[in-house]
Amino acid sequence: MNNRVGISGYSIMLGDEFFMREAISLARAAECLGEVPVGAVVVRAGEIVGRGFNSPIGESDPTAHAEIAALRDAARNLGNYRLPGCELFVTLEPCAMCAGAILHARIARVIYGARDPKTGVHGSVVDLFGVERLNHHT
């Protein structure tokens, strides 16, 4: 059975909406804390293995982005910083810092809810994920 559905030129997997809704829920938690509302989940084999939301203000940490928090949570839960076969669902297009972490973690697929014309590096400003010289592609 084909579990891909094409929408507006994009290919999505059935179930993607469920995981993006979880990321949106985490973004709302960030917003309630006065943070930029971004949430993220890491999924492996249809199961959420990591969750995170933006918290740089509350943690006084410029690296406390949703993607980084979700990657850290997944790495702890799986016992390895390398996360091949995992997918990342995030509400906003990743920035350069997060893209570097995503590449190092060897995430197989990144799904984001909205483009970020100021700092997005999955095509809005540049496309770091498309640079083959970055040697951590899965």
Across the structure, where does each feature detected by a protein language model lie?
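Alpha-helical structural signal
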Residues: 16, 20, 38-39, 67, ...
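Short, basic/aromatic recognition patches
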Residues: 12-33
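Small-residue (primarily alanine) positions within well-ordered alpha-helices
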Residues: 23, 27-30, 40, 50, ...
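Short beta-strand scaffold segments in enzyme catalytic cores
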Residues: 38-46
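Short, basic and Ser/Thr-rich N-terminal targeting/leader segments
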Residues: 34-38, 84
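Zn2+-dependent cytidine deaminase-like catalytic core
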Residues: 50-138
